[in-house]
Amino acid sequence: MGCLGNSKTEDQRNEEKAQREANKKIEKQLQKDKQVYRATHRLLLLGAGESGKSTIVKQMRILHVNGFNGDEKATKVQDIKNNLKEAIETIVAAMSNLVPPVELANPENQFRVDYILSVMNVPDFDFPPEFYEHAKALWEDEGVRACYERSNEYQLIDCAQYFLDKIDVIKQDDYVPSDQDLLRCRVLTSGIFETKFQVDKVNFHMFDVGGQRDERRKWIQCFNDVTAIIFVVASSSYNMVIREDNQTNRLQEALNLFKSIWNNRWLRTISVILFLNKQDLLAEKVLAGKSKIELFVLDDRLFQERPFSFIEDYFPEFARYTTPEDATPEPGEDPRVTRAKYFIRDEFLRISTASGDGRHYCYPHFTCAVDTENIRRVFNDCRDIIQRMHLRQYELL
Protein backbone atom coordinates (compact mmCIF):
# COMPACT_ATOMS: atom_id res chain seq x y z
CA MET A 1 0.00 0.00 0.00
CA GLY A 2 1.58 3.34 -1.06
CA CYS A 3 2.31 6.14 1.35
CA LEU A 4 -0.10 8.91 0.50
CA GLY A 5 2.02 11.43 2.44
CA ASN A 6 4.84 11.28 -0.18
CA SER A 7 2.67 11.52 -3.23
CA LYS A 8 2.87 14.76 -5.25
CA THR A 9 0.42 16.19 -7.62
CA GLU A 10 1.36 17.04 -11.17
CA ASP A 11 1.13 20.72 -10.29
CA GLN A 12 3.56 20.32 -7.40
CA ARG A 13 6.09 18.48 -9.55
CA ASN A 14 5.84 21.16 -12.24
CA GLU A 15 6.27 23.88 -9.64
CA GLU A 16 9.42 22.24 -8.24
CA LYS A 17 10.83 21.81 -11.72
CA ALA A 18 10.19 25.47 -12.49
CA GLN A 19 11.86 26.43 -9.21
CA ARG A 20 14.96 24.35 -10.00
CA GLU A 21 15.22 25.96 -13.43
CA ALA A 22 14.82 29.41 -11.90
CA ASN A 23 17.57 28.63 -9.38
CA LYS A 24 19.88 27.50 -12.19
CA LYS A 25 19.25 30.76 -14.06
CA ILE A 26 19.96 32.78 -10.93
CA GLU A 27 23.15 30.81 -10.27
CA LYS A 28 24.24 31.26 -13.88
CA GLN A 29 23.58 35.01 -13.72
CA LEU A 30 25.44 35.31 -10.42
CA GLN A 31 28.40 33.50 -11.95
CA LYS A 32 28.28 35.80 -14.97
CA ASP A 33 28.07 38.88 -12.74
CA LYS A 34 31.04 37.62 -10.74
CA GLN A 35 33.08 37.20 -13.92
CA VAL A 36 32.16 40.70 -15.09
CA TYR A 37 33.00 42.10 -11.65
CA ARG A 38 36.38 40.38 -11.58
CA ALA A 39 37.11 41.56 -15.12
CA THR A 40 36.36 45.21 -14.26
CA HIS A 41 39.20 47.58 -13.41
CA ARG A 42 38.14 49.84 -10.53
CA LEU A 43 40.07 53.10 -10.32
CA LEU A 44 39.78 55.36 -7.30
CA LEU A 45 40.59 59.05 -7.84
CA LEU A 46 42.01 60.64 -4.71
CA GLY A 47 43.69 63.96 -3.98
CA ALA A 48 43.20 67.26 -2.20
CA GLY A 49 40.49 69.71 -3.21
CA GLU A 50 40.81 71.47 -6.59
CA SER A 51 43.56 69.15 -7.82
CA GLY A 52 41.72 68.26 -11.04
CA LYS A 53 40.12 64.90 -10.23
CA SER A 54 36.72 65.73 -11.69
CA THR A 55 38.39 67.09 -14.83
CA ILE A 56 40.08 63.71 -15.33
CA VAL A 57 36.64 62.07 -15.14
CA LYS A 58 35.28 64.50 -17.74
CA GLN A 59 38.17 63.58 -20.02
CA MET A 60 37.28 59.89 -19.73
CA ARG A 61 33.76 60.77 -20.86
CA ILE A 62 35.08 62.76 -23.81
CA LEU A 63 37.57 60.06 -24.79
CA HIS A 64 35.58 56.89 -24.06
CA VAL A 65 31.87 57.66 -23.48
CA ASN A 66 30.92 59.78 -26.49
CA GLY A 67 31.40 63.04 -24.60
CA PHE A 68 28.52 65.28 -23.52
CA ASN A 69 25.21 65.62 -25.35
CA GLY A 70 23.33 68.85 -26.01
CA ASP A 71 21.15 68.59 -22.91
CA GLU A 72 24.16 68.06 -20.66
CA LYS A 73 25.94 71.06 -22.19
CA ALA A 74 22.84 73.21 -21.71
CA THR A 75 22.68 72.36 -18.01
CA LYS A 76 26.29 73.51 -17.57
CA VAL A 77 25.69 77.03 -18.91
CA GLN A 78 24.52 78.23 -15.49
CA ASP A 79 27.56 76.71 -13.76
CA ILE A 80 29.90 78.43 -16.23
CA LYS A 81 28.18 81.79 -15.72
CA ASN A 82 28.47 81.27 -11.96
CA ASN A 83 32.21 80.59 -12.38
CA LEU A 84 32.54 83.84 -14.33
CA LYS A 85 30.65 85.79 -11.67
CA GLU A 86 32.63 84.23 -8.83
CA ALA A 87 35.90 85.04 -10.61
CA ILE A 88 35.32 88.78 -11.08
CA GLU A 89 33.74 89.12 -7.63
CA THR A 90 36.67 87.42 -5.92
CA ILE A 91 39.29 89.52 -7.70
CA VAL A 92 37.71 92.93 -7.09
CA ALA A 93 36.87 92.03 -3.48
CA ALA A 94 40.52 91.11 -2.87
CA MET A 95 41.95 94.39 -4.19
CA SER A 96 41.50 96.35 -0.96
CA ASN A 97 42.43 93.42 1.30
CA LEU A 98 45.86 92.65 -0.11
CA VAL A 99 49.05 94.03 1.45
CA PRO A 100 49.82 96.34 -0.20
CA PRO A 101 46.33 96.91 -1.61
CA VAL A 102 45.75 97.20 -5.34
CA GLU A 103 44.04 100.21 -6.87
CA LEU A 104 42.13 100.52 -10.11
CA ALA A 105 44.20 101.82 -13.00
CA ASN A 106 41.14 103.79 -14.07
CA PRO A 107 39.37 105.30 -11.01
CA GLU A 108 36.28 105.88 -13.15
CA ASN A 109 35.70 102.11 -12.96
CA GLN A 110 34.88 102.33 -9.25
CA PHE A 111 31.13 102.36 -9.92
CA ARG A 112 31.61 99.06 -11.76
CA VAL A 113 33.35 97.58 -8.71
CA ASP A 114 30.48 98.81 -6.54
CA TYR A 115 28.00 97.09 -8.86
CA ILE A 116 29.89 93.76 -8.84
CA LEU A 117 30.15 93.79 -5.04
CA SER A 118 26.47 94.70 -4.69
CA VAL A 119 25.35 91.57 -6.55
CA MET A 120 27.76 89.19 -4.79
CA ASN A 121 25.14 87.47 -2.65
CA VAL A 122 22.08 87.93 -4.84
CA PRO A 123 20.27 84.55 -5.04
CA ASP A 124 19.21 83.30 -8.48
CA PHE A 125 21.10 86.10 -10.23
CA ASP A 126 19.76 86.50 -13.77
CA PHE A 127 22.93 87.91 -15.44
CA PRO A 128 21.59 91.11 -17.04
CA PRO A 129 23.58 92.79 -19.87
CA GLU A 130 25.10 95.35 -17.48
CA PHE A 131 26.79 92.56 -15.52
CA TYR A 132 28.79 91.48 -18.58
CA GLU A 133 29.54 95.11 -19.47
CA HIS A 134 30.95 95.87 -16.01
CA ALA A 135 32.82 92.56 -15.75
CA LYS A 136 34.51 93.06 -19.12
CA ALA A 137 35.50 96.66 -18.41
CA LEU A 138 36.99 95.66 -15.06
CA TRP A 139 38.84 92.70 -16.52
CA GLU A 140 40.49 95.13 -18.97
CA ASP A 141 41.59 97.42 -16.10
CA GLU A 142 45.32 97.02 -15.38
CA GLY A 143 44.70 97.29 -11.65
CA VAL A 144 42.30 94.33 -11.73
CA ARG A 145 44.87 92.40 -13.77
CA ALA A 146 47.55 93.21 -11.20
CA CYS A 147 45.29 91.83 -8.48
CA TYR A 148 44.71 88.71 -10.56
CA GLU A 149 48.49 88.20 -10.83
CA ARG A 150 48.59 87.99 -7.03
CA SER A 151 45.83 85.38 -6.83
CA ASN A 152 48.01 83.04 -4.77
CA GLU A 153 47.38 85.48 -1.89
CA TYR A 154 43.66 84.73 -1.84
CA GLN A 155 41.29 81.95 -2.97
CA LEU A 156 40.51 82.15 -6.70
CA ILE A 157 39.24 79.37 -8.95
CA ASP A 158 41.71 78.17 -11.61
CA CYS A 159 39.32 78.86 -14.47
CA ALA A 160 39.01 82.59 -13.67
CA GLN A 161 41.15 83.90 -16.53
CA TYR A 162 39.76 81.37 -19.01
CA PHE A 163 36.14 82.43 -18.53
CA LEU A 164 36.87 86.14 -18.06
CA ASP A 165 38.61 86.08 -21.43
CA LYS A 166 35.40 84.61 -22.93
CA ILE A 167 32.86 87.11 -21.60
CA ASP A 168 31.72 88.09 -25.10
CA VAL A 169 31.05 84.44 -25.95
CA ILE A 170 29.38 83.44 -22.68
CA LYS A 171 26.96 86.38 -22.67
CA GLN A 172 25.31 85.32 -25.94
CA ASP A 173 21.75 83.99 -25.64
CA ASP A 174 22.61 81.03 -27.89
CA TYR A 175 25.84 80.18 -26.07
CA VAL A 176 26.66 76.46 -26.16
CA PRO A 177 29.69 75.38 -24.08
CA SER A 178 32.57 73.70 -25.88
CA ASP A 179 34.26 70.59 -24.50
CA GLN A 180 37.06 72.84 -23.26
CA ASP A 181 34.51 75.04 -21.46
CA LEU A 182 33.09 71.95 -19.74
CA LEU A 183 36.57 70.80 -18.74
CA ARG A 184 37.35 74.20 -17.23
CA CYS A 185 34.03 74.56 -15.40
CA ARG A 186 34.45 74.23 -11.65
CA VAL A 187 31.73 72.66 -9.49
CA LEU A 188 32.50 71.44 -5.98
CA THR A 189 32.42 67.64 -5.80
CA SER A 190 30.47 66.37 -2.81
CA GLY A 191 29.86 62.66 -2.38
CA ILE A 192 30.99 59.80 -4.59
CA PHE A 193 30.50 59.68 -8.35
CA GLU A 194 31.06 56.61 -10.52
CA THR A 195 31.86 56.78 -14.23
CA LYS A 196 31.82 53.60 -16.32
CA PHE A 197 33.62 53.28 -19.63
CA GLN A 198 35.21 50.68 -21.86
CA VAL A 199 38.56 50.73 -23.65
CA ASP A 200 39.37 47.92 -26.09
CA LYS A 201 36.62 45.75 -24.55
CA VAL A 202 38.04 46.23 -21.05
CA ASN A 203 35.62 47.64 -18.47
CA PHE A 204 36.71 50.50 -16.22
CA HIS A 205 34.84 51.98 -13.28
CA MET A 206 36.29 55.30 -12.08
CA PHE A 207 35.24 56.68 -8.69
CA ASP A 208 35.56 60.42 -8.05
CA VAL A 209 35.23 61.60 -4.46
CA GLY A 210 35.39 65.08 -2.95
CA GLY A 211 38.88 66.19 -1.94
CA GLN A 212 38.09 68.75 0.75
CA ARG A 213 38.90 67.67 4.29
CA ASP A 214 35.28 67.14 5.33
CA GLU A 215 34.71 64.85 2.32
CA ARG A 216 37.60 62.47 3.02
CA ARG A 217 35.77 60.40 5.64
CA LYS A 218 33.71 59.01 2.73
CA TRP A 219 36.80 57.63 0.97
CA ILE A 220 36.94 54.40 2.96
CA GLN A 221 33.62 53.36 1.39
CA CYS A 222 35.45 53.05 -1.94
CA PHE A 223 38.51 51.09 -0.82
CA ASN A 224 37.05 47.61 -1.35
CA ASP A 225 38.39 45.73 -4.41
CA VAL A 226 40.15 48.77 -5.86
CA THR A 227 42.49 47.91 -8.73
CA ALA A 228 44.54 51.10 -8.48
CA ILE A 229 44.50 54.55 -6.95
CA ILE A 230 45.01 57.57 -9.17
CA PHE A 231 46.31 60.29 -6.87
CA VAL A 232 45.96 63.75 -8.43
CA VAL A 233 48.16 66.67 -7.37
CA ALA A 234 47.88 70.34 -8.32
CA SER A 235 51.59 70.86 -9.01
CA SER A 236 51.08 74.60 -9.43
CA SER A 237 49.77 75.00 -5.88
CA TYR A 238 53.19 75.32 -4.22
CA ASN A 239 52.49 78.98 -3.31
CA MET A 240 48.83 78.64 -2.32
CA VAL A 241 46.94 77.74 0.85
CA ILE A 242 43.92 75.46 1.18
CA ARG A 243 40.41 76.89 1.43
CA GLU A 244 39.63 74.98 4.60
CA ASP A 245 41.94 76.97 6.91
CA ASN A 246 43.65 79.61 4.72
CA GLN A 247 46.97 78.61 6.31
CA THR A 248 48.15 75.18 5.17
CA ASN A 249 50.23 75.15 1.99
CA ARG A 250 48.31 73.28 -0.70
CA LEU A 251 51.25 71.26 -1.99
CA GLN A 252 52.25 70.32 1.55
CA GLU A 253 48.65 69.25 2.18
CA ALA A 254 48.85 67.00 -0.90
CA LEU A 255 52.14 65.50 0.32
CA ASN A 256 50.67 64.80 3.77
CA LEU A 257 47.57 63.26 2.22
CA PHE A 258 49.63 61.10 -0.12
CA LYS A 259 51.70 59.86 2.83
CA SER A 260 48.58 58.91 4.80
CA ILE A 261 47.18 56.99 1.82
CA TRP A 262 50.48 55.31 1.01
CA ASN A 263 50.82 54.08 4.60
CA ASN A 264 47.14 53.20 5.11
CA ARG A 265 46.94 49.58 6.30
CA TRP A 266 43.93 48.91 4.06
CA LEU A 267 45.81 50.06 0.96
CA ARG A 268 49.21 48.44 1.49
CA THR A 269 48.79 46.24 -1.60
CA ILE A 270 47.23 48.90 -3.86
CA SER A 271 49.64 50.69 -6.19
CA VAL A 272 49.30 54.40 -6.88
CA ILE A 273 49.38 56.14 -10.25
CA LEU A 274 50.52 59.67 -9.45
CA PHE A 275 49.13 62.41 -11.71
CA LEU A 276 51.29 65.51 -11.22
CA ASN A 277 48.62 67.74 -12.66
CA LYS A 278 48.33 71.39 -13.79
CA GLN A 279 51.72 71.35 -15.49
CA ASP A 280 50.60 74.26 -17.68
CA LEU A 281 49.98 76.47 -14.65
CA LEU A 282 53.20 75.32 -12.99
CA ALA A 283 55.19 76.35 -16.08
CA GLU A 284 53.51 79.77 -16.13
CA LYS A 285 54.40 80.40 -12.49
CA VAL A 286 57.99 79.21 -12.80
CA LEU A 287 58.66 81.32 -15.88
CA ALA A 288 56.97 84.35 -14.33
CA GLY A 289 59.27 83.93 -11.34
CA LYS A 290 62.21 85.28 -13.32
CA SER A 291 60.88 88.80 -12.62
CA LYS A 292 63.25 90.93 -10.58
CA ILE A 293 62.64 91.77 -6.94
CA GLU A 294 60.68 95.01 -6.51
CA LEU A 295 60.48 97.50 -3.64
CA PHE A 296 57.38 99.34 -2.49
CA VAL A 297 56.52 101.80 0.28
CA LEU A 298 53.45 101.52 2.52
CA ASP A 299 52.85 103.90 5.43
CA ASP A 300 56.49 105.06 5.30
CA ARG A 301 57.71 101.46 5.64
CA LEU A 302 59.88 99.86 2.97
CA PHE A 303 58.77 96.43 1.79
CA GLN A 304 60.48 94.00 -0.55
CA GLU A 305 58.23 91.96 -2.80
CA ARG A 306 58.70 89.32 -5.41
CA PRO A 307 55.84 89.83 -7.86
CA PHE A 308 55.82 86.08 -8.41
CA SER A 309 56.65 83.50 -5.78
CA PHE A 310 59.66 81.23 -6.10
CA ILE A 311 59.37 77.59 -5.08
CA GLU A 312 62.22 77.91 -2.57
CA ASP A 313 60.17 80.51 -0.69
CA TYR A 314 57.87 77.65 0.32
CA PHE A 315 60.13 74.61 -0.03
CA PRO A 316 63.67 75.74 0.92
CA GLU A 317 65.17 72.41 -0.16
CA PHE A 318 64.43 73.37 -3.78
CA ALA A 319 67.42 75.77 -3.65
CA ARG A 320 69.74 72.74 -3.35
CA TYR A 321 67.88 70.55 -5.84
CA THR A 322 69.41 69.64 -9.19
CA THR A 323 67.52 68.15 -12.12
CA PRO A 324 67.94 64.34 -12.03
CA GLU A 325 69.62 62.39 -14.80
CA ASP A 326 66.42 60.48 -15.59
CA ALA A 327 64.58 63.71 -16.45
CA THR A 328 63.05 63.77 -19.94
CA PRO A 329 61.96 67.34 -20.74
CA GLU A 330 59.16 68.06 -23.17
CA PRO A 331 60.36 69.47 -26.53
CA GLY A 332 61.31 73.12 -26.06
CA GLU A 333 60.74 73.01 -22.31
CA ASP A 334 62.59 75.62 -20.26
CA PRO A 335 65.17 73.96 -17.94
CA ARG A 336 63.68 75.83 -14.97
CA VAL A 337 60.32 74.21 -15.61
CA THR A 338 61.93 70.77 -15.89
CA ARG A 339 63.74 71.27 -12.60
CA ALA A 340 60.57 72.43 -10.84
CA LYS A 341 58.33 69.59 -11.98
CA TYR A 342 60.91 66.90 -11.18
CA PHE A 343 61.47 68.41 -7.74
CA ILE A 344 57.76 68.03 -7.01
CA ARG A 345 57.80 64.50 -8.41
CA ASP A 346 60.73 63.55 -6.21
CA GLU A 347 59.04 64.94 -3.09
CA PHE A 348 56.29 62.35 -3.58
CA LEU A 349 58.69 59.56 -4.54
CA ARG A 350 60.65 60.18 -1.33
CA ILE A 351 57.51 59.23 0.58
CA SER A 352 56.81 56.10 -1.46
CA THR A 353 60.41 54.84 -1.34
CA ALA A 354 60.88 55.62 2.36
CA SER A 355 58.13 53.21 3.38
CA GLY A 356 57.94 50.92 0.38
CA ASP A 357 57.75 47.21 1.16
CA GLY A 358 57.55 45.81 -2.36
CA ARG A 359 53.81 45.18 -2.18
CA HIS A 360 52.76 48.39 -3.92
CA TYR A 361 54.43 50.89 -6.23
CA CYS A 362 54.12 54.53 -7.26
CA TYR A 363 54.01 55.41 -10.98
CA PRO A 364 54.36 59.19 -11.60
CA HIS A 365 53.05 61.00 -14.70
CA PHE A 366 53.04 64.69 -15.63
CA THR A 367 49.54 65.75 -16.65
CA CYS A 368 47.44 68.69 -17.78
CA ALA A 369 43.86 67.62 -17.12
CA VAL A 370 42.35 70.21 -19.49
CA ASP A 371 44.48 68.90 -22.39
CA THR A 372 42.59 66.00 -23.96
CA GLU A 373 45.55 64.70 -25.96
CA ASN A 374 47.79 64.72 -22.91
CA ILE A 375 45.26 62.70 -20.89
CA ARG A 376 44.71 60.31 -23.81
CA ARG A 377 48.45 59.64 -24.01
CA VAL A 378 48.95 59.33 -20.26
CA PHE A 379 45.98 57.01 -19.77
CA ASN A 380 47.16 54.79 -22.62
CA ASP A 381 50.55 54.60 -20.91
CA CYS A 382 48.81 53.66 -17.66
CA ARG A 383 46.65 50.88 -19.07
CA ASP A 384 49.42 48.27 -19.06
CA ILE A 385 50.22 49.18 -15.47
CA ILE A 386 46.54 48.91 -14.50
CA GLN A 387 46.21 45.55 -16.28
CA ARG A 388 49.23 44.23 -14.37
CA MET A 389 47.75 45.45 -11.09
CA HIS A 390 44.46 43.76 -11.95
CA LEU A 391 46.14 40.42 -12.66
CA ARG A 392 48.08 40.66 -9.41
CA GLN A 393 44.86 41.54 -7.56
CA TYR A 394 43.31 38.19 -8.48
CA GLU A 395 46.61 36.31 -8.15
CA LEU A 396 46.89 35.64 -11.85
CA LEU A 397 50.38 37.12 -12.01
Swiss-Prot record:
Region (G2 motif): 181-189
InterPro entries, sorted: Gprotein_alpha_S (IPR000367), Gprotein_alpha_su (IPR001019), GproteinA_insert (IPR011025), P-loop_NTPase (IPR027417)
Annotated segments matching region G1 motif: 42-55
Domain G-alpha: 39-397
Alphabetized SUPFAM superfamilies for the sequence: P-loop containing nucleoside triphosphate hydrolases, Transducin (alpha subunit), insertion domain
Lipidation (N-palmitoyl glycine): 2
GO annotation, cellular component aspect: cytoplasm; heterotrimeric G-protein complex
Listed GO biological process terms: adenylate cyclase-activating adrenergic receptor signaling pathway; adenylate cyclase-activating dopamine receptor signaling pathway; adenylate cyclase-activating G protein-coupled receptor signaling pathway; sensory perception of chemical stimulus
GO molecular function: adenylate cyclase activator activity; beta-2 adrenergic receptor binding; corticotropin-releasing hormone receptor 1 binding; D1 dopamine receptor binding; G-protein beta/gamma-subunit complex binding; GTP binding; GTPase activity; insulin-like growth factor receptor binding
Amino acid composition bias (Basic and acidic residues), ranges on this chain: 8-23
Membrane topology: Lipid-anchor
Region (G3 motif): 204-213
Compartments where found: Cell membrane
A Pfam family assignment: G-alpha
Keywords: Cell membrane, GTP-binding, Lipoprotein, Magnesium, Membrane, Metal-binding, Nucleotide-binding, Palmitate, Transducer
Disulfide bridges in this chain: none
Residues binding Mg(2+), per UniProt: 54, 189
Family, per entry: Belongs to the G-alpha family. G(s) subfamily.
Binding partners and assembly: Heterotrimeric G proteins are composed of 3 units; alpha, beta and gamma. The alpha chain contains the guanine nucleotide binding site. Interacts with CRY1; the interaction may block GPCR-mediated regulation of cAMP concentrations. Interacts with ADCY6 and stimulates its adenylyl cyclase activity. Interacts with ADCY2 and ADCY5. Stimulates the ADCY5 adenylyl cyclase activity. Interaction with SASH1.
Known role: Guanine nucleotide-binding proteins (G proteins) function as transducers in numerous signaling pathways controlled by G protein-coupled receptors (GPCRs). Signaling involves the activation of adenylyl cyclases, resulting in increased levels of the signaling molecule cAMP. GNAS functions downstream of several GPCRs, including beta-adrenergic receptors. Stimulates the Ras signaling pathway via RAPGEF2.
Name of this chain's protein: Guanine nucleotide-binding protein G(s) subunit alpha
